[in-house]
């Protein structure tokens, strides 16, 4: 029984910390006048820690949320730019990766909450605020390329032991061909392909 109480306390404490971490991202749209509004946020590694996301070593980003409030709908435009420090997928060397992205969201009001469509959000009538932290988080994460490659690999300025070893083991490398004899059975199979 005591373990359950401690577990419940820890879960409650974590939930309270998350709510506190995301509180600055609440936009209370009820008190705003009809028209354009802008909200700016500085995003660092603590933002990603609140989401329990550990893909970035560090982050220095700016997020801008533009709200165009109309009588029946809210038009949001999210823009993110800055740098995240990540590990290269090839060499595991750290580097700063430039991030830029934008996303538009239309918020409408209805009987119940519905976020089935990625660009339309329906909030229940009577809602007075909206938290934009999840949208900023997803925009940043989805703006990162699938393969994170150190820029020094492309321009040849990166000196890395891993990169040297990969180059040495490259089968297209002539040095590799000299060091490794080809089994004569494979040569016979190659001849079958070229005899046609």
Question: Predicted segment positions?
Answer:
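Surface loops and adjacent helix of pleckstrin homology
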Residues: 79, 100, 145
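A positional/architectural concept
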Residues: 6-90
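Charge-rich, low-complexity linker and terminal segments
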Residues: 2-29, 110-196
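Basic (Lys/Arg-enriched) interaction patch that binds polyanionic ligands
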Residues: 85, 93-94, 186-191
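Residues that recognize and position ribonucleotide moieties
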Residues: 41, 96-97, 133
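Helix-adjacent hinge/juxtasegments
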Residues: 87-116
């Amino acid at each position: 029984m005591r373990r359950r109480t401690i577990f419940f306390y820890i879960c409650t404490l974590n939930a309270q910390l998350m709510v506190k971490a995301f509180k600055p991202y609440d936009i209370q749209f009820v008190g705003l006048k009809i028209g354009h509004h802008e909200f700016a946020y500085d995003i660092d590694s603590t933002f990603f820690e609140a989401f329990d996301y550990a893909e970035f070593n560090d982050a220095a980003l700016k997020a801008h949320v533009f709200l165009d409030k109309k009588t029946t709908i809210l038009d949001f435009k999210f823009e993110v730019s800055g740098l995240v420090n990540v590990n290269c997928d090839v060499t595991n060397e750290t580097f700063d990766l430039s991030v830029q992205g934008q996303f538009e969201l239309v918020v409408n009001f209805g009987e119940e909450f519905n976020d089935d469509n990625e660009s339309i959000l329906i909030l229940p009538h009577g809602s007075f605020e909206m938290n934009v932290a999840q949208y900023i988080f997803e925009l940043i994460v989805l703006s990162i390329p699938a393969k994170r490659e150190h820029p020094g690999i492309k321009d040849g300025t990166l000196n890395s032991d891993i990169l040297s070893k990969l180059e040495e083991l490259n089968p297209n490398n002539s040095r590799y061909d000299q060091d490794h004899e080809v089994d004569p059975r494979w040569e016979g199979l190659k001849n079958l392909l070229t005899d046609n």
